[in-house]
């Protein structure tokens, strides 16, 4: 295993620990009473932001598709948000909101532009002949949404859902770390770093990656089952 090989080459537990040591720390963390409370704290805020950004971005993209002025109005601030460094955004938000919900706002604003621009791109690529057919046969707004719009943006929905999930977790945990949000995964990472406990740093990192991947696969499964053929 490459990780184990590098650990043996470095041979310094203050810099790098092996996989067995990292997983030993995971089991030690799981024995602590606060472990699942910490997971719940971070997961709830990050996932709430992710799903809210998904549905709001879909609504905004649909409105922008129908009203060009709205697209021109919100594109500049969204481009700014998409390119603003997480650290700068965290510091700015600390002046306006409390630390407890910092990861929610950061995860939301990092994932919203991804969803919005991908959904809008998919809508602009819709087959105009199909849309014309829907008008001729007088599809209701709901049926147009269900049978044409959603299947039409399905590829963009999958790609953006995957990309935004990873970014939501990375930016959310980074916000917790920078903002020193207590009872969060980010705070535990910072505390382990200050204590020079690399085993715990790797343990929390593995936990974060595992949670991100688990929910990514879960969301993709739901989208593939529910949206691929407009079955909503």
Model region roles, listed by residue range:
Residues 1-10:
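N-terminal signal-anchor transmembrane alpha helix
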Residues 9-51:
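Periplasmic/extracellular loop-to-transmembrane helix junction in inner-membrane transport proteins
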Residues 48-78:
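Transmembrane-helix boundary motif in ABC transporter permease subunits
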Residues 68, 159, 202-232:
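C-terminal transmembrane helix and the adjacent membrane-cytosol boundary/short C-terminal tail
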Residues 79-114, 121:
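Generic hydrophobic transmembrane alpha-helix motif, especially the helices
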Residues 95, 171-208, 231-232:
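Glycine-rich helix-loop "coupling/hinge" segments at transmembrane-helix boundaries
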Residues 105, 109, 141-174, 215, ...:
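Transmembrane alpha-helices
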Residues 118-157, 189:
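Short cytoplasmic-facing helical segments at TM-TM junctions of multi-pass membrane proteins
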